Amino acid sequence: MTKAITLAIFMVVLVLGMVTKETQGEEKQCYDYLLTPQENCEGLICAHECTMQHGGNGVCVDTTSTVCICTYDCTS
């Protein structure tokens, strides 16, 4: 009886975890390319500009490039 209850609880937790994962992935991601004013892209400046403009996460493409890729949740 204890094994059956433990198995049932485990299955409920597993199913709820899968449902939660599916609903979180429904948000559409948008991308924007930001040009940094410096000669080289700096990670902190890229992240700050992306957060201020879109509320997202900014990542430098390359340290020798001036391109910053901003990823954020689309509202529409």
From Swiss-Prot:
GO terms for cellular component: extracellular region. It is found in: Secreted. It comes from the Eukaryota. Residues 1-25 form the signal peptide. GO terms for biological process: defense response to fungus; killing of cells of another organism. Keywords: Antimicrobial, Disulfide bond, Fungicide, Plant defense, Secreted, Signal. Disulfide bonds join 30-74, 41-60, 46-68, 50-70. InterPro entries: DEFL (IPR010851). Belongs to the DEFL family. This is Defensin-like protein 125. It comes from Arabidopsis thaliana. The gene is LCR54.
